[in-house]
Amino acid sequence: MNTRLEKFYKENVVPALMKEFGYTNPMEVPKLVKVTLNMGVGEAATNKKILENAVADMSKISGQKPVVTKSRVSVASFKIRDGWPIGCKTTLRRAKMYEFLDRLINISLPRVRDFRGVSGRSFDGRGNFNMGVKEQIIFPEIDFDAVDAIRGMDIAITTTAKTDAEAKALLAAFKFPFRN
């Protein structure tokens, strides 16, 4: 069961990157490993309902149940203690990862207000890409009227690319909307 984006990768992206970087074997071509979604909900320390709504939103967006993240240390200025739930995260792999990226690239990112593309500088030096989304309502799975608060999330795309140039070429081949 190949998704649309996975089929596109095998038929179009692999030959294009082999030609661009001079790979001799298709297994050398960088590929997507996982997409990690993280939502930090600082207000969850005082109100548990906020965290429940964040978990529900993320499960709708990702298609699987997220893990509740807990604080590691007590911070008096943030009014949190060690072990209190303060967010949620989920890791998408294989088919769910490709489905999520397909929706992100073709539906969600164009729905962002004043969208001019994502920054091409958000690579970590080892071929992974990180980006933030300011509001979860850009995803089609979220009903705008049922949202209690606008929350953002972090999206980390992990690849097998050795360099940032390879990773950027991989994501650009997937028609990822880079600004520059």
UniProtKB/Swiss-Prot annotation:
GO biological process, one term: translation
Keywords, in A-Z order: Ribonucleoprotein, Ribosomal protein, RNA-binding, rRNA-binding, tRNA-binding
Presence of keyword Nuclease: no
GO molecular function (one): RNA binding
InterPro entries, A to Z: Ribosomal_uL5, Ribosomal_uL5_bac-type, Ribosomal_uL5_C, Ribosomal_uL5_CS, Ribosomal_uL5_dom_sf, Ribosomal_uL5_N
Keyword Ribonucleoprotein in record: yes
Pfam families reported in the protein's UniProt record: Ribosomal_L5, Ribosomal_L5_C
GO cellular component, one term: cytosolic large ribosomal subunit
SUPFAM superfamilies: RL5-like
Entry-linked PROSITE patterns: RIBOSOMAL_L5 (PS00358)
Subunit structure: Part of the 50S ribosomal subunit; part of the 5S rRNA/L5/L18/L25 subcomplex. Contacts the 5S rRNA and the P site tRNA. Forms a bridge to the 30S subunit in the 70S ribosome.
Protein function: This is one of the proteins that bind and probably mediate the attachment of the 5S RNA into the large ribosomal subunit, where it forms part of the central protuberance. In the 70S ribosome it contacts protein S13 of the 30S subunit (bridge B1b), connecting the 2 subunits; this bridge is implicated in subunit movement. Contacts the P site tRNA; the 5S rRNA and some of its associated proteins might help stabilize positioning of ribosome-bound tRNAs.
Family note: Belongs to the universal ribosomal protein uL5 family.
PANTHER family assigned: 60S RIBOSOMAL PROTEIN L11-RELATED
Protein name: Large ribosomal subunit protein uL5
Originating species: Xanthomonas campestris pv. campestris (strain ATCC 33913 / DSM 3586 / NCPPB 528 / LMG 568 / P 25)
Gene: rplE
